[in-house]
């Protein structure tokens, strides 16, 4: 989710690209629980730039995710996304939150074993995110009733236990992580090893552009 990415050649662009689409218009069967559009996230509040609880992605990434969903459904599961395109203003909000030592209301759920002042130095929070380029998605597996499966940790858990291949994760959680990774890898998604939920579609449609338009259906050009 919050990997450090190069800002060389980055363009902070407040105008949406015509190559974005709401995921629901591409595959409405994929579940959406857009965490930063509500208070259930590590900041404890709606995050700047999230005007609607919708997933927006560059079109090639959205189509690839739909292909992965077909395979996951065939296996008796479904995909659920937590975050997709993320405006730069949201990333800036994360950095401000991480720098506010007084606000610790979400520590027990999201970062119980790391001090808040270590979140930036240890790479959990960064000044740039691949999500702002539009081809990265935070995603998990659910059963067909849309109940999330055991993945070993919650989403956005700032801890080495969230590393995709952490050896302490065994049994069903290990099987679920491996299934998620293999299904997405087959469609061109690359996992971030430090976060089991974080995948980037390659090649990216906008590899050098960090967008800042708000998350809303109206912000995406037809």
Language model feature labels by segment:
Residues 11-84, 89-194, 203-222:
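Extracytoplasmic cell-surface/polysaccharide-interacting catalytic and binding patches
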């Amino acid at each position: 989710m919050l990997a450090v990415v190069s800002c060389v050649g980055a363009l902070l662009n407040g105008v949406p690209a015509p190559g974005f689409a709401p995921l629901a218009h591409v595959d409405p069967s994929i579940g959406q629980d857009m965490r930063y559009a509500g208070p259930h996230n590590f900041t404890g509040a709606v995050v700047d730039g999230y005007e609607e609880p919708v997933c927006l992605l560059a079109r090639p990434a959205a189509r690839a995710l739909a292909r992965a969903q077909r395979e996951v459904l065939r296996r008796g599961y479904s995909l659920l996304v937590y975050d997709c395109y993320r405006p730069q203003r949201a990333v800036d909000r994360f950095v401000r939150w991480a720098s506010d030592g007084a606000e610790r209301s979400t520590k027990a759920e999201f970062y119980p074993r790391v001090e808040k002042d270590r979140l930036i130095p240890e790479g959990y929070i960064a000044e740039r995110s691949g999500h702002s380029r539009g081809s990265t998605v935070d995603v998990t597996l659910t059963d067909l009733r849309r109940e999330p499966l055991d993945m070993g940790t919650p989403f956005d858990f700032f801890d080495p236990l969230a590393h995709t291949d952490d050896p302490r994760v065994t049994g069903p959680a290990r099987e679920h992580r491996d299934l998620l990774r293999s299904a997405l890898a087959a469609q061109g998604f690359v996992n971030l090893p430090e976060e089991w939920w974080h995948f980037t579609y390659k090649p990216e449609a906008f590899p050098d552009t960090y967008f800042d338009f708000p998350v809303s259906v109206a912000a995406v050009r037809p």
